[in-house]
Amino acid sequence: MKTGIIVSRRDSLRFGLLTGASALLPAAARAANARGSNVPPTPVRWIDDAAPPLSLGQTFGVPWPQGALRAGTALSVKDAEGKALPSQHWPLASWPDGSLKWTAHALPAGDTPSASMTVVQGKPVAPPAPVLLRETADRIMITVGLVQWTIGKSGNSIIQSAKAGERTVMGSLALIASVDNAPQGGERSHFTGRIDKATVEQKGPVRAVVKLEGMHEGQGRAWLPFVVRLYAYAGADHLRVVHSFIFDGDPARDFISGLGVRAQVPMDAAPHDRHVRISTGADGLFSEAVRPLTGLRRDPGAAARKAQIAGQAVAIDAMAPTVRNLLDRIPTWGDFTLSQLSADGFAIAKRTKAGQAWIDATSGTRSQGLGYVGSPTGGVAIAARYFWQRHPAQIDIRGADTDQASLTAWLWSPNAQPMDMRPYRDVMGMEAYAAQNEGLDITYEDYEPGWDDATGAARTSELTLWACAATPGAAHLAAMAQANATPPQLMVTPERIHAADVLGIWSLPDRSSPLKARIEDQLVNLVDFYAEEVDRRGWYGFWNHGDVMHTYDEDRHVWRYDIGGYAWANSELSPDLWLWYDVLRSGRARAFRLAEAMTRHTGEVDVYHLGRFAGLGTRHGVQHWSDSSKQPRVSNAAYRRIFYYLTGDERVGDLMRALVPSDQALTHVEIGRKVPGAERKTLPEGVVDFSFGTVWGSLAAAWLTEWERTGDVRWRDRLVAGMDSIGRLKYGWLAGSAPYDLKSGRFIGSGDKISISHLNAVFGAFEVNAELLQLIDVPRYRAAWLDYCRWFNASPQEWDAHFSLPFGKRNLKEGHSRLTAYVARETGDAALSTRAAREFLGGEAGLGLSDGDPRVAHSGPDFVRLTVEWPGVSTNAASQWGLAAIQNLALIPDALEWAAAEKRN
């Protein structure tokens, strides 16, 4: 079978574009690249358009045109003045010819990083104090400058200790959890994380990564499997902590009442030199001492007060005797708590010790989730990202008046109601398929008893842990909190990514005509609308944050949060892809962070990571697991891969790799089991009916990614087997589905019936096919795909003239315009280009292109709050319009202009 690489004239033009890009670089960077061969210079920018005051360390991905970068080529990073920066790089993906397709690059942590950077060919510079990692039989030691972390390889301490200089500033760091056996008033059990496996993934010199895997154990039970990654960067006194866990309990009896990370902090300073700091907002801090010296009846002196407020040691001899002699009469405050039980409110309270009353200290709206306890001789800070967004969260400091304090970042606050993972509804007499289909008909929910199961859902949280040599100043603590809450991110410029010809078909922003400006405006407005709706509608909470709603209720002026299949979107019709393609072309921070939060949600919460549904995701619903339709189209690796390549994120890499064998889940989960009128097929063992788009296309994204990441031709061959066998069917892609042999990876049967679904191409199949056909030459598959693209949106008359078969139902004409545009571009058919442009601008079964900004603000008693509405919007329509706009601008820009002029006339 012939396989190979398709190199088009467009690819050649992109190589020229890359060559021209070097003129935009500093002379030093151009000279460095001149000494190389084909390595194009790569400008890198901060997504916020400005250098941050503090970077906690950076990892970003760089794409390379095919053939431009040989494996093993040394790469360096230079700042805006051409000075080489310490850096580390490694491969992420390869082209079929073995050249590198994506590399990841790490830069140290530090203040005032360069405003812009360039990746060039050349030996990387080592940092002044490289990350040093040493592994023994029972522990892993990481040293960064004066800070040393000792990490356990077994036992209950994720980190055994941390030293700043010669002083141990932190003892054990452990994962903790508690569970109640009833939603209210239940018996509580406590659990601690136990390490079962430790793996060193990187050893420096700029970045080291340790992966820890285990379970939470206690009360004779081991459950809540976890993966924790610890990241150390050169120049840093902190570790990045990425904490992932899977809920593997029984929703009817396991109500998690606390989930967190707890550090033990040695305390030996005088009580008045022990400091507590808790972030209260964007730049606010709650700053107190265990024994306060301010506000007393007697004045200790300005120097003492100033030193305590600044977090510095108080000179006891210089203190006024009227205070110095009565210090033991001033109460010490050992316990502090910030509880963020909603997205819009937190409260801070403190008490002298256990058994005494809590005293309210202050309250506010949105804490950034950083807590610190320590003294002028050292301490520990910890911060949780998405702290208020993923409420209920909490920061606890306990025993600050004793020899050992504890500092806890709660991902689920023990002050909140326990986590309730039960289904939101009961059976309601819907035991049989007939009743279930009636329910689907009225609420759009696919319900089946026992399939609305939360067991197997996961959540990943990101934290930062600092080992501080002294109490940081207020401004630096605020910068630490901000850098954790909204991490600065480097990204290659959109122009350079586009020129590398990666990630399928997409366009750069183009406002060169009134029509294109209207399209660009709507692309910006849509992202802004959804980003703002997250806050207006309160799409927050531990399990909800990152997702958006499916459909709007124009009568109640709310999204349909309580109506069956109209509530949480769960990746329906690819909002993840729309947002990531918007990021690629715009580089906008708002789009990036909206897409990032969605990726963290949809790849974890909406997907099963263990149990009978492992590898499948859940269709849109009131709860993220409530719909009984479990599908590969939701777990889809296509929704994760752009984030992975832009950031090198190891957790997302794990999630995509876990999907590689997920086709096997369909041997015991029949996803089409109750479709009305569906033909029940008796198939041989190991053969499952697959749709080409929503099933095979989703799995193909995982196999494509694994082939790129590993170079293992098994996955290329599996792709080729599927492609070739679809191409051999009588009607190819128009057959819609066919029996699939899991062992050979081939579709079997004749494919002699046409079965068109409007869903088949809108869960990443268009985007994955664009990449497959760029990489693998299977002519009969290409013909089958182009045939589908040509005929999906064809008129009934054209269809009848060609097939003499029933036309059938169609939907999503606007979104499918990009399929018409693709076949037009590939065949050079001007008539199809015009048809595609008319389909897109016609807006049928889609969002439509607005003339101006359609958003309307409302307030008053008919609305819950100040409300902004986009008439006719749904996430399905927004996602497909966004993708069609981005891709049609790349495929048929001239035809769009002609069709717009035709429409005006």
Outline where the language-model segments fall.
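N-terminal secretory signal peptides and thylakoid transit peptides that target proteins
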Residues: K2-G20
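C-terminal segment of N-terminal export signals and the immediately downstream linker at the start
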Residues: A27-T42
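Surface-exposed beta-strand/loop patches in extracellular or lumenal glycoproteins
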Residues: A51-A71, I256-Q264
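Solvent-exposed beta-strand/loop surfaces of large extracellular or lumenal domains
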Residues: K78-K101, M430-I442
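An acidic-aromatic substrate-binding cleft motif
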Residues: P127-S154, G473-Y581, R585, G617-H620
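Beta-strand/loop-rich accessory regions of lumenal/periplasmic or secreted enzymes
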Residues: R139-V492, H545-D553, A567-N570, S628-Q631
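Terminal, non-catalytic domain-edge segments
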Residues: A474-A483, T705-D717, A721-G732, G736-S755, ...
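Catalytic cores of eukaryotic secretory-pathway lumenal/extracellular enzymes that build
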Residues: V534-N570, T602-W715, K730-H758, V762, ...
